[in-house]
Amino acid sequence: MGAKFSKPSQAKDSAKVENLSLQHHLINYLSKSFYIRNLVSKQRRRMLVAGYDLDMSYITDHVLAMSFPAERMRAMYRNPLWQVKSVLDMRHQGHYKIYNLCIEESYDPSHFHGRVESFPFDDNHVPPLQMIKLFCENVSSWLSSHPKNIAVIHCMAGKGRTGLMVCAYLVYCGMSPEDALQLYAQRRTTNNEGVSIPSQRRYVGYWAKCLSFPKGVYNGPPEVKLPEPCRRELQRIRLYDTVNTESIFFVVSELQEIPSQLYRPSMELTRNRCRQFKKGYERNDSPRYFLSFVEAKNKGNEPELEPHLVVQMDTECSALYHKTCLDYNFEKPLPLTGDVRIIFYAKMFGGRLFYACFNTAFIKNSLLQLRLPDLDKVGKKGRSICGPSFCLELVFGPANAKHSFFTPSDDENASDDMS
């Protein structure tokens, strides 16, 4: 009986081998097609090395950014892994380490002699500040261990997440956030648009505020002081100057820390919708809270600044009475701590309009306001509901005085786009 089935089985195996061989030749041919990969890489700079056309750029002499080193069918439009390995071995034999920022895909570290580190976070989003710290310390340690060492950093497309972490390292080395973002944009793209997602740029600014250089810039690594976890209570979400809609849905999430795991998944806390309120409606169930510093005389009759909690009701200017605003007032304030993500949708499930990420430790005066340029991935549908004065406003309850008081000088010196 076995002899009767041997020929069909052999024919099937032979066909499988032939198909795999054909697939390999097809991938090899298409991976050499400059057109396909140039189309996918868009405005990212490419390198032509040893006949290979690769999506990679030197940001500095020791930091290289690139797209994902792919295998199989994905190699048709990403960097083929074997070509990346060949170029790195040729240029930096024994002196390169790969940093993979993808959570969605990985590869066998043995392809790169085991020198692969993983710092995964979600595409088009931000990592926790603790991960940025570990990443910068790891890169610094590797580069300082030998003058020829380089760090090769990639996500999937090799632009947003890669840019955030490259810029974070440049800031760690003493550059300002603005200079780091500008350098990355110039070296990585042809249109000078490097890290284009506002929340990712915001986190580069957050990271800069965690660093100090007591020995001076370029005299050793900086001191890193991450903010203590700061609990804030979200009381109201308001969308100013909306058009063509009577309600917008939202989802609020936090990055959840998991023991012994570097990746922090987003955990949904609540979902609801902002609705249009009637003009003249008194929203006294959700006042604004502010910390006001006023002069108070002590026993020595010398004026001192003392923080006082001030409750201010809604007092929009008259121009806003003619605008449509969408509100959601929390019956019970929503506690938030650390890294927060808020996404807005046209429908309860699906139809994303835009989103924003922020850290609660960097909120000033219990108020966070983001205009259209400060929001992430605003598409055609998102823009269609935003008027010229559109603004997202999040109102929080009193801050934890121990960790998040901002003095008047703090408020004056902090830039709006890093809020």
For the regions a protein language model found, what residue spans apply to each?
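Cysteine-based protein phosphatase catalytic domain of the PTP/DSP
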Residues: A15-A151, Y172-Q182, R187-G194, R236-S419
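Short, hydrophobic/amphipathic alpha-helical patches that form generic packing surfaces
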Residues: A168-Y172, G205-Y206
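Long all-alpha helical scaffold domains
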Residues: R161-A168, M175, D179-A180, S196-S199
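Glycine-centered flexibility motif
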Residues: G2, Y35, Y52, G160-G163
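A phosphate-binding catalytic loop at a beta-strand-loop-alpha-helix junction
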Residues: H146-A168
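PEST-like, low-complexity acidic/proline-rich intrinsically disordered segments
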Residues: M1-V17
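Catalytic cores of secreted or luminal carbohydrate-active enzymes
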Residues: T189, E193-C230
